[in-house]
Amino acid sequence: MSKIVDDGEGDTIFAIDRVSEEILIKFIDREIASHVPIVLIAEGLDGGKVVLPRGSSESEAVWRIIVDPIDGTRGLMYQKRSAWILTGIAPNLGDDTKLSDIEFAIQTEIPLVKQHLSDTVWAFRGQGAKAERFNRLTGEITSIDLRPSSSESIEQGFAMISRFFPGVRDVLAEIDEEIVRGALGSPISGKAQCFEDQYISTGGQLYELIAGHDRFVADIRPLLAKAMSERGLDLSICCHPYDLCTELIARELSVIVTDENGLPLSSRLSNETDVAWVGYANRSIRDQIEPHLQSSIRKRGMLRD
């Protein structure tokens, strides 16, 4: 399942991804497209999207459904962390349909083999969010209450800049250090001011914010293009709209999700767009962290137009 089967645009496609995409198309075609025409957007599809049922035109579609069949493939392949099935549904506004147009989102945990519990979280715009936990040993499903952290500081909490892959991890670490130093001051002898968790799954990171496990997460990899170019390197894999198609859930639970400029996410629903995003558990955390984050990336000339 860890064999690479496609390394084109978007993320690397592993064998496990290919299997999930085939199942996805059949499921959407049978359960949804048999009732209403839709545009399915997912990595691995020819051209990045397909209109279902077959033979329908894109202009006829009522909905655009963007899916990441397995977000967190690498951690799941090696049985390190759960992965997630991410789905966002927006009215079909053509190619200009954006993340901000998504009306319904759902993410479902794909547990490790040794793990018997898995969560599903979903939200309709303006109606809050709900969550359930499934016990695959007993078949029992129970409602769970997920709440973001109410802490007013990142001190003694999980807070991090994502730096999953090589290239400019040193730059990202410098930014991380500047933010923490600005927010918490100099390290104290024998103490850990805050901690990090490099969860290679955007859906997983959003879940950690939703569940109150993380207080601050920023994935600003797209802003590193210049720094990598100066080193003679190409920009490596970044976050894409399908990775963020469930951010509606986080917002419905009062998690603050922005782009690098502090604005709501507004990327078009596509497979190629590189997206930078920042998540804060609450307003106090944003007030504590955002000025230092903005200062750090601005002084490096990293902000995009």
Q: What residue spans do the PLM features occupy?
A:
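A short glycine/serine-rich beta->alpha loop
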Residues: 7-13, 71-75, 194-196, 234-237
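Short, conserved micro-motifs enriched in small and acidic residues
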Residues: 11-19, 77-80, 200-203, 237-244
